[in-house]
């Protein structure tokens, strides 16, 4: 191995356990969607599982990361789903690829709009009446201190996320009813963040003199310091949202 690996330990690109993923797939396929749209899909693991559970459905994944999309295409081929899914390397802003019966937007609302209310309005536009939206969105368990914010991501601010009650309220204001509200556990966060860095940490231990080692080490150390700071402070909500139909 001569270059740092990327995300090979991750099944999902977020704090999502296998049991929760199974529950989400079961809930999101209850209304038998025939079209699925995945915003900021990455390698689209959750969408592929939904397609496998709903043989009549087709899916579209949108992302700007070519490497992640290639991983998604390989996974689709391995599962015999190639003819039912397409992966598009493009921006999701103003996307014409809707409406869909099921819209997934997990950790990717910023791909639709800069502010959460506008992103929620876009999700309402992109989902069919009687469809579902799965929104995976960050929230604060408590307001972080200035010292904590300084150790998180660059220019982190207490206004970067709402609290959970405010988040759900924004979804209601955008024309949804919350069918189900759940949040990632601390175990899910620790599994995700550890898997996110695991291969890189092993590579750094085995290649300390590599030309890329210094910058890779600095990046890994910065990310670890950030997540150990927002651990227990930053949450991720999984909201299953039902659009309110026009009267």
Predicted feature residues:
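A short acidic, Gly/Pro-enriched loop at the edge of an enzyme's catalytic core
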Residues: 93-103
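Class I SAM-dependent methyltransferase SAM/SAH-binding core
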Residues: 45-93
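Conserved Class I S-adenosyl-L-methionine
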Residues: 182-247
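Conserved class I S-adenosyl-L-methionine
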Residues: 33-42
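A short glycine-rich, Lys/Arg-flanked "PGG" loop and its adjoining helix->strand segment in the class I
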Residues: 117-132
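A short SAM/SAH-binding and catalytic strip from SAM-dependent methyltransferases
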Residues: 101-115
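Short, glycine-/aromatic-enriched active-site segment of Class I SAM-dependent methyltransferases
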Residues: 138-158
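Conserved alpha-helix/loop element of class I SAM-dependent methyltransferases that forms part
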Residues: 14-32
């Amino acid at each position: 191995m001569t270059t740092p690996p990327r995300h090979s330990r991750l099944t999902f690109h977020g704090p999502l356990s296998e049991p929760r993923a199974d529950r989400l797939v079961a809930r999101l396929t209850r209304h038998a969607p025939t079209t699925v749209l995945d915003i900021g899909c990455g390698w689209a693991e959750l969408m592929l599982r939904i397609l496998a559970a709903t043989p009549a459905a087709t899916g579209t994944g949108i992302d700007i990361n070519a490497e992640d999309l290639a991983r998604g295409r390989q996974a689709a081929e391995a599962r015999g789903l190639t003819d039912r899914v397409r992966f598009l390397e493009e921006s999701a802003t103003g996307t014409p690829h809707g409406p869909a019966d099921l819209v997934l937007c997990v950790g990717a609302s910023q791909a639709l709009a800069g502010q959460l209310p506008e992103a929620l309005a876009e999700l309402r536009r992109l989902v069919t009446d009687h469809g579902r939206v799965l929104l995976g969105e960050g929230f604060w368990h408590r307001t972080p201190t200035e010292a904590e914010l300084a150790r998180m991501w660059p220019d982190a601010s207490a206004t970067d996320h709402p609290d959970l009650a405010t988040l759900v309220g924004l979804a209601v204001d955008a024309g949804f009813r919350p069918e189900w509200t759940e949040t990632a556990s601390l175990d899910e966060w620790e599994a995700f963040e550890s898997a996110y860095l695991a291969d890189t940490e092993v590579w750094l231990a085995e290649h300390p003199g590599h030309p890329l080692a210094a910058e890779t080490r600095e990046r890994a150390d910065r990310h670890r310091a950030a997540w150990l700071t927002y651990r227990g402070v930053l949450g991720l909500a999984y909201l299953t949202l039902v659009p309110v139909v026009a009267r």
